[in-house]
Swiss-Prot record:
One of its GO terms (molecular function) is RNA binding. It comes from Caldanaerobacter subterraneus subsp. tengcongensis (strain DSM 15242 / JCM 11007 / NBRC 100824 / MB4) (Thermoanaerobacter tengcongensis). Pfam families: Ribosomal_L7Ae. The keyword Membrane does not apply. SUPFAM superfamilies: L30e-like. Keywords: RNA-binding. Belongs to the eukaryotic ribosomal protein eL8 family. The keyword RNA-binding applies. This is RNA-binding protein TTE2299.
Length: 82
């Protein structure tokens, strides 16, 4: 059974990659200070699928944008099923 795409925004590298691969994603946010090995697959998948990447200065700032109290390397705006 296919996984349902979450509404609105997902946070974190694993959830972002899953959304990019399985859902319609409007854009992906990546913190500039995130470690490259954490975001590499996400960047590649976005490039392959033509998804816009928005770079945010820090993980802390991205976490705050997503309404969480810790830093986040990535997040994605999900707009529906692929």
């Amino acid at each position: 059974m296919a996984e349902q795409c979450p509404p609105k925004r997902v946070v974190g590298a694993k959830q972002t990659l899953k959304a990019v691969l399985n859902c319609k994603v409007a854009q992906v946010y990546i913190a500039k200070d995130a470690e490259e090995h954490v975001v590499k697959k996400i960047k590649e998948a976005c490039e392959e699928k033509g998804i816009k990447i928005v770079y945010i200065d820090t993980m802390k700032e991205l976490g705050r944008m997503c309404g969480i109290d810790v830093g986040a390397a990535t997040a994605a705006d999900v707009i529906g099923e692929r």
